[in-house]
């Protein structure tokens, strides 16, 4: 838990009964904010299996055994939906995905200390233990980070580990919130949270899964087959509730798209595909998807976006200049470079007149994007004054 005295924090309570959970959530709904974390298992399944929810209040911390028989989690859903209570997470994306699946909605309002830390200049995706140490002087014991949280009973060491995540988070949140409020940057955090508040962020569209494999050809017939095969895998993995790579690996999908097998015997020849798979239900539905894609008219086939084609590659020199500008702006404003602009943002800035990228919206445009466009268009250039990068107006 912490090198500091455990008396700093309330002793964790293990919740296994519905009446205790209801009472806890009633108490927490009277507070201005609550810190939240989850422990789950996903190594053997497509859908995450929620095993533990941790809730931290001013005077209480609870570890909720979500696998306890007949435990009614409805009070947790009501707490998450309460607009009067800020829900505080660190690196919340997977937690929110789980709550969206379980309760059908995204917690509101919420605050992610990982996002806030990047806005406050702690670097790209700073680790939680680093934040705890820097902002509170505490220490996170990592011994149980890879525990099997589905096994019961939970040990006292697991309970203490789970509770520590939300107890330390209170100090992290309060320090970051106060710092960003003083610097006038809380609105920046709110802009970032808009993405995490959008249900579309957590949806997986089977039809677009092929793009993750980043194929190097623009043969549209091949891409049509790859799109169909990847979509099939996503739907089948969901149906079987197994990880997509356990069902069939990416390399196998690429090979199947190239060979376009028409029967089980041909499918079984593909790397990583056995005869049992090819002749079973999964093999039959995969072959049906391939056959359907093979019959698509040319107009319905996908293509790689033009910005990724060889003829639209960005100028390495211009991208390098944009990276220098990004580093300078990041240092000037004490904000993580990755939060200002991604590598894809820089590539598109270098190849498109005014691309639709995050770097050109909201506070990012004010801090970096507008000058990036000016640099690309020759309206400013970069100079060096001692150890500082300077922007020089041309003309």
UniProtKB/Swiss-Prot annotation:
What SMART domains does UniProt report for this protein, alphabetically? 35EXOc (SM00474), HRDC (SM00341)
Leader sequence residues:
none
- Reactions catalysed, as given in the entry: Exonucleolytic cleavage that removes extra residues from the 3'-terminus of tRNA to produce 5'-mononucleotides
- Lineage, top-rank taxon, reads Bacteria
Arranged from A to Z, the UniProt key words for this protein are: Cytoplasm, Exonuclease, Hydrolase, Nuclease, tRNA processing
Question: Which ranges carry the HRDC domain?
Answer: 219-300
Outline the extent of the 3'-5' exonuclease domain.
Answer: 14-181
Which GO BP terms apply?
Answer: tRNA 3'-end processing
Q: Which GO terms describe its cellular component?
A: cytoplasm
Q: What is its EC number?
A: 3.1.13.5
Required co-factor?
a divalent metal cation
The record's subcellular location field reads: Cytoplasm
Q: What does this protein do?
A: Exonuclease involved in the 3' processing of various precursor tRNAs. Initiates hydrolysis at the 3'-terminus of an RNA molecule and releases 5'-mononucleotides.
By sequence similarity, the record places it as follows: Belongs to the RNase D family.
- HAMAP family associated with the record: RNase_D (MF_01899)
For this entry, the protein name equals Ribonuclease D
Q: What gene is this protein a product of?
A: rnd
